[in-house]
């Protein structure tokens, strides 16, 4: 689960981190009133969506009048913002963040992730702030400095000082950086973060550190013990099909191809997508129905897959380990009849009662193509999607 920038900054403020005074507004009038409350003669207005690249897409603007703020809010509220991190539809803008302006002398980067290789929370800092950290990692990895947090001892001030020296901070800034580092590390642990970024962490013209942006990703598996964070969830930013699938405990991710995929097991699902690509096809989705693939869940999975108008054929790839393939076959038949599937369906069954499952499909009288292997399944579904 992701948080909006204004939500991230509210958490930063709770931990004593320096952030701009700002207000998240639902209407243009609220945005104008927020500017009056903040004071000054320049403000920054930002569209609140779960995506980066807002500035390049016109979703961030420095304004010098309340008329500009009103025009910006009226232009964006209720519309979708398309960036390089969204799909072609973009993300809906329901709130505008109005903030005071900050005079910037230098931009830094500070972030943290759960690193699977070290099995630790790892902080990353760089002098190359304001740009994608992935670009820095690819071209100048030596400019990224790290600190690994030991879960037994927690964050240590010396780690902050070490990063601060590498960033070239002066003694006053070092104290500020240490406070920011310790606050973020404690926040990361307290609220079960999966990702945290301040990009940029700026040095103002007065020489102080300031959190100019904020990005937070939460470990979804920990939301049961984070009621406050869970309440911050904005369902408007979720893909509607993915949200619907989650209600039926289906793991679905929409893609941009034309071959629908229904598989039991995440690893097998990724392998299925790979082999479809290998044979010239493009998967329309990732969908893992899990170990308990009942008729009801299979039917719902078909509905979700076919809600994508780009889908021209469906590949069902099931390995019968926990579940029997003959039961899965009956579920597929029932689902196809219930949903009224109009596109070709290719089914590959392996494992417990696989042969019996194929017989059930063959006797169904439905236009279901039974594949003999994974390679055969991929070849058949790609041909079917191409209308061959």
Curated annotation (Swiss-Prot):
Q: Which residues bind Mg(2+)?
A: 199, 213
> Which residues does the record give as substrate binding sites?
264, 321-323
Cofactor note, please? Binds 1 Mg(2+) ion per subunit.
Domain ATP-grasp as annotated: residue spans: 9-244
The alphabetized UniProt keywords are: ATP-binding, Ligase, Magnesium, Metal-binding, Nucleotide-binding, Tricarboxylic acid cycle
A Gene Ontology annotation in the biological process aspect, one of them, is: succinyl-CoA metabolic process
What this protein needs as a cofactor is: Mg(2+)
Family, according to the entry, reads as follows: Belongs to the succinate/malate CoA ligase beta subunit family.
Summarize the subunit comment: Heterotetramer of two alpha and two beta subunits.
Protein name in UniProt:
Succinate--CoA ligase [ADP-forming] subunit beta
- UniProt source species: Shewanella denitrificans (strain OS217 / ATCC BAA-1090 / DSM 15013)
């Amino acid at each position: 689960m992701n948080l909006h920038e204004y939500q991230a900054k509210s958490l930063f403020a709770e931990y004593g981190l320096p952030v701009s005074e700002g207000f998240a507004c639902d209407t243009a009038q609220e945005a104008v009133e927020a500017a009056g409350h903040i004071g000054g003669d320049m403000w920054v207005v930002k569209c609140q969506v779960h995506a980066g690249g807002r500035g390049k897409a016109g979703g961030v603007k420095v304004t010098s009048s309340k008329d500009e703020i009103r025009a910006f809010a009226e232009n964006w509220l209720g519309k979708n913002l398309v960036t390089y991190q969204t799909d072609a539809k973009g993300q809906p803008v329901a709130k505008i963040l109005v903030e005071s302006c900050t005079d910037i002398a230098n931009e830094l980067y500070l972030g943290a992730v759960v690193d699977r290789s070290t099995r630790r929370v790892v902080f990353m800092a760089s002098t190359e702030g304001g740009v994608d950290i992935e670009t820095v990692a690819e071209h100048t990895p030596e400019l990224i400095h790290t600190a690994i947090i030991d879960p037994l001892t927690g964050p240590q001030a010396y780690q902050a000082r070490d990063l601060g020296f590498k960033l070239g901070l002066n003694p006053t800034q070092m104290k500020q950086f240490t406070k920011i580092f310790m606050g973020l590390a404690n926040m990361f642990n307290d609220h079960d973060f999966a990702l945290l970024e301040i990009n940029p962490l700026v040095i103002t013209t007065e020489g102080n550190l300031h959190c100019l942006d904020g990005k937070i990703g939460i470990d979804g598996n920990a939301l049961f013990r984070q009621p406050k964070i869970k309440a911050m969830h904005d369902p408007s930013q979720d893909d509607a099909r993915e949200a619907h699938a989650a209600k039926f405990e289906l793991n679905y991710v929409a893609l941009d191809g034309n071959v629908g995929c229904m598989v039991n097991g995440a690893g097998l699902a990724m392998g299925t997508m790979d082999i479809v690509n290998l044979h010239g096809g493009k998967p329309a989705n990732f969908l893992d129905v899990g170990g308990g693939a009942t008729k009801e869940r299979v039917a719902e999975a078909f509905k979700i897959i076919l809600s994508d108008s780009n889908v021209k054929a469906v590949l069902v790839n099931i390995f019968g380990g926990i579940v029997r393939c003959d039961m899965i076959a009956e579920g597929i038949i029932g689902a196809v009849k219930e949903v009224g599937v109009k596109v070709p369906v290719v089914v590959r069954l392996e494992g417990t009662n696989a042969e019996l499952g194929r017989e059930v499909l063959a006797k169904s009288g439905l236009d279901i193509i039974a594949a003999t292997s994974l390679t055969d399944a991929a070849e058949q579904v790609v041909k079917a999607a191409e209308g061959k």
